Each structure stands twice: as C-alpha cells, then as structure tokens.
Swiss-Prot record:
Induction: Up-regulated by auxin and paclobutrazol. Belongs to the iron/ascorbate-dependent oxidoreductase family. GA2OX subfamily. InterPro entries: DIOX_N, IPNS-like_FE2OG_OXY, IPNS-like_sf, Iron_ascorbate_oxido_reductase, Oxoglu/Fe-dep_dioxygenase_dom. It comes from Arabidopsis thaliana. Pathway: Plant hormone biosynthesis; gibberellin biosynthesis. This is Gibberellin 2-beta-dioxygenase 3. Residues 175-278 form the Fe2OG dioxygenase domain. One of its GO terms (biological process) is gibberellin biosynthetic process. GO terms for molecular function: gibberellin 2-beta-dioxygenase activity; metal ion binding. It comes from the Eukaryota. SUPFAM superfamilies: Clavaminate synthase-like. Its EC number is 1.14.11.13. The active site is at R269. Catalyzes the 2-beta-hydroxylation of several biologically active gibberellins, leading to the homeostatic regulation of their endogenous level. Catabolism of gibberellins (GAs) plays a central role in plant development. Converts GA9/GA20 to GA51/GA29 and GA4/GA1 to GA34/GA8.
Length: 335
C-alpha cells in the first residue's frame, strides 16, 4: 500500500553554502563476507570515516517493515504526533534540531535504544501506532546492536587492540547509551532554486552510527579536501559513520565524518540512524595500546556524560572536540 505523506509546515530559507560543490567520488563498499573485510573497514575509517556495507545479515523484510511503519507514523495528523513532542530529548520533533537554534527541513522520532527506559513522549509514540511498530523497532535495535559490536570487534582484531573487547564492550553492555533516530524529510511542493538544508552539517558524537535510508538522495559527506560528496542511496545496504568518540579512542587515526542532508527533490526521504554510544560513566581517552607515549595523546580524558553535555550546549556544526584537545605547552619560542 502506498501512502502519500503530508508535507509538514517548515521554514524554507535554509540554504546550503554555495561554495560547497558536490562532486562524485567512490565511497568504500565493504562486503562483510569477505575474508579481508576488517582490513577494508580500518582503511575506510582512516581515509573517509565512512563506508557502505553489503551482506550485513539484517533481514530485508525487517527493513521494509520498519520503514513502512515509520511512514505510517509520519502520515498521522499533526495533532496526534504532537502528543509525543516536543522531544525531551526523546520523542517526536519537527524542524528544530537541538536547543540552540539549529533548524532543518524534517520531522523525526528519537528513541532510547533501551526501550525499558521509556519517557512519557516515547510512550505516546507507540500509543498511537500498531503493536507491530514497536515490535519492529525492538528487533531493529537488537540487529543494530549486533552489527555495531561486530564492526568494533573487527577494528579491534585488525588494530590488535588490547585488552580484547575494549571497544565492542562499550556498545554491548546494557548500560550502553545508544539511541535510534528516524527522520522524515518531506517532499517539496515546488522545486527550490538552490539546495536547501534538510539536516545541517555535523559529526556524530558517539562511537559509530549505522544509517539506512530509502532510495531518495540527499545525504552528503565532507571529504579531506573540504569538498562535499553526494552519497548514492541504497535501501538494501547500510552506511557506517565514525563518530567523535571513536576518533578520540584511536587518537585521531580514525576521523569522525562531517555529513549533512540536503533537500532538492520532490520525493520524501526516510532515514533510520542507530547511534552506538558508550555508558554515561565510561572514561574516554586515546587507547594506550595505540599511543604508547602519553605525550603523544591528542586528547584529554573525559567521560561520555561530560562530552554529551558539552555537545548539547553547542550549535550543530561546531567543532566539539576542540574543548578536549591537548594544547602544546606554552613556550617563549612560540611567541
């Protein structure tokens, strides 16, 4: 059954920086059944902080079902959706991204990956949707937890990280602070003169993010030379993004990828992003096995809770890690 989504009421003066010209580039594609997949993953994390995954083991019917249930929710009358908002941070939200004035052409649902910790807002989401929606969300979160821990295990093996599970444990434990976000970018009634912001440029603060969308374009990543690159959508695959926390723990060897979504189509876009985060009390610092000399560490130690709070106080596109970088000692020779 095809459902036509009702465009929400959004501001339309959100334009992309015209100095950023998207260009084609070959995004790494990694087949998880390949014998050298872990080597490819590490290379992609170093060069792009981003890669596409095929043969991931997640059932296609689960992806289709969750997408359709998300479409059904976003098609509800705004009076019903608004009962699950504004987000706290979980729940339903529109247009406003965070508390610091960032705006986008979207509406979204944000859910705690531990559904036992439901808020009043997330309870309202499932109250107005069929039970199959919650069931699909629960199974999807289970699959994302499996996949995120698998990726980190492969990184551990390739980099010979000790002790074992130093990274993957952070997303496996029940205290893991992970979440699932479902975004809906409504179709445009008129073709815009220039590209508009759906979700502004940013990096993700967690360890890694697993992104899956329908076949509508819009996602872009920023490569090393500062150029924005269009990512060709593929509804059957996942895209993995390195987050700030993994950048710190690898002492900058992996780079968290700056990305954004632009709306330049009459087709609506649905995306689902699983943010795999560590426990709130976890101490985050460069891994000693990767940085034998303490003086070579680029970042000071902090807890995930501290970083999360700091990120919450910033604008979407701010460089959040700057507050936690080690500064070279002051010297008169530098004056």
């Amino acid at each position: 059954m095809v459902i036509v989504l009702q465009p929400a009421s959004f501001d339309s003066n959100l334009y992309v920086n015209p100095k950023c010209k998207p260009r084609p580039v070959l995004i790494p594609v990694i087949d998880l059944t390949d014998s050298d997949a872990k080597t490819q993953i590490v290379k992609a994390c170093e060069e792009f902080g981003f890669f596409k995954v095929i043969n991931h083991g997640v059932r296609p019917d689960l992806l289709t079902q969750l997408e359709q249930e998300a479409i059904n929710f976003f098609a509800l009358h705004h009076s019903l959706k608004d009962k699950a908002g504004p987000p706290d941070p979980f729940g339903y939200g529109t247009k406003r991204i965070g508390p610091n004035g960032d705006l986008g052409w979207l509406e979204y649902i944000l859910l705690n990956a531990n559904l036992c910790l439901e808020s009043h807002k997330t309870t309202a989401i499932f109250r107005h949707t069929p039970a199959i929606f919650r069931e699909a969300v629960e199974e999807y979160i289970k699959e994302m937890k499996r996949m995120s821990s698998k990726f980190l295990e492969m990184v551990e093996e390739e980099l010979k990280i000790e002790p074992k599970e130093k990274l993957s444990r952070l997303v496996k434990v029940k205290e893991s602070d992970s979440c699932l976000r479902m975004n809906h970018y409504p179709e445009k009634e008129e073709t815009p003169v220039k590209e508009e912001i759906g979700f502004g440029e940013h990096t993700d603060p967690q360890l890694i993010s697993l992104l899956r969308s329908n076949d509508t374009e819009g996602l872009q990543i920023c490569v090393k030379d500062g150029t924005w690159v269009d990512v060709t959508p593929d509804h059957s695959s996942f895209f993995v993004l390195v987050g700030d926390t993994l950048q710190v723990m690898t002492n900058g060897r992996f780079k968290s990828v700056k990305h954004r979504v632009v709306t330049n189509t009459k087709r609506s876009r649905i995306s689902m992003i699983y943010f795999a985060g560590p426990p709130l009390s976890e101490k985050i610092a460069p891994l000693s096995c990767l940085v034998p000399k303490q003086d070579d560490c680029l970042y000071n130690e902090f807890t995930w809770s501290q970083y999360k709070l700091s990120a919450y106080k910033t604008k979407l596109g701010d460089y959040r890690l700057g507050l936690f970088e080690k500064r070279p000692p002051f010297s008169l020779s530098n004056v």
